């Protein structure tokens, strides 16, 4: 340790940065492992104390983001997102441009409320169904869905972790935090520009391609089960806000083997009904003796289906926990809307710190029974949390060691006395490239200290630099690996790696131009 502590702190910080970027780009190690490795490396090289190296895990930003994952889960699991999507898209008709306009605006608003990934995951099945009804290949609608969601993340403070991070950096630089709705000043123009480009140009820049891997559509799934099991029940009676169905397969060595069942019987616990049974391609009639491999169609309350699907001896074909997400305004939806509304009021008024508002909402959702404790833990993207917590110390090291000042001085000497606009443009080009290769969250945590140093050297406000940084970090459009949302739509639409940049490049240019020329008008240097 004594030898390591004599390593030049600036050199150590820059070497750790380069190694981290290489690890991120190579994709050979989990993101969380890389982030933790960064924090530990900063400690072992003596750049940071142990408290500083681990401070990210107790940072209010990390707690705020973790709580927002629970809020997002509640909106998704109770069918609020599905309900909103169905109501809006049902009025859009089947014209391609109208669909793109409606889908783009809808996902932008939803992503501002529940995150980019949550919005795309919630609306993806619905958009595929709409594409089928409009006789359009999903490839014409799904990439616009992901890209419009990224634009929508700039509408509110809670739209993406990046927004929260740049706001915290602003406070750390001695300036005010960005307001909850303040991001809309740049977010609204970005959403409008993005949706217009998607509406009028995506047809020529996207492939006409189908994919065999399609997401679940609840009503189509229910109709398929009704047909396969020769049921006389109406589809609307199979699934609803309170009750649903799930198909389970009897596993080998299941305790159910040898028992007798018949259609219409209730299970021994009294909370589920056996609607029908199949053995191979044949629908079984009357009383049967259960064998391994038999398929049973069970109906009951969603909570009961979820509980029994996890029991030993049966294998659910589709998880009822996932199926219930596609029920509009399911159990707990009203409570969720009230709690989320209260959180938005707290965030907008600033009555309590953002992390406190989100934690209060998350606790209220758990205590009111909307989200179960295991479900709350499972909803949190621990990769994202660990990534941010592990990379925050790198930002601290950049500032503490003077590495940020060194890089800032190098950039400024490279461009000469060209003023803040050129400095901003150069910094944003670096950000744009990095955000296509590694997480945009990690990119911002790396670049933000450099942005603050450049602003301080030029004697200008850091706010336009930080807001512009958030804008360009959201422009992760050129590769499928740039964001999880880009990857989500890849298989259902049949996209290939080279499909993304064709539509992504015009959007990236739009975001870059807005960041360089429009942002400083709203947040002056």
Task: Identify the function of each model-found stretch.
Residues 10-15, 32-37, 63, 97-105, ...:
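Hydrophobic alpha-helical transmembrane segments
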Residues 133-143, 153-232, 296-314, 470-525:
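Juxtamembrane and boundary regions of transmembrane helices in multi-pass small-molecule transporters
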Residues 33, 40, 47-134, 194-207, ...:
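Membrane-embedded alpha-helical segments and adjacent helix-loop junctions characteristic
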Residues 96-109, 135-152, 181-183, 420-433, ...:
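Alpha-helical transmembrane segments of multi-pass membrane proteins
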Residues 408-413, 420-494, 498-513, 517-522:
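Generic detector of multi-pass transmembrane helix bundles and their immediately adjacent loops
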Residues 38-39, 83-85, 117-130, 142-146, ...:
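Re-entrant/interfacial helical elements at transmembrane boundaries that shape
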Residues 20-29, 106-115, 147-157, 345-351, ...:
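Transmembrane alpha-helix interface/packing and boundary motifs in multi-pass membrane proteins
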Residues 1-66, 70-72, 204, 209, ...:
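Hydrophobic transmembrane alpha-helices of multi-pass small-molecule transporters
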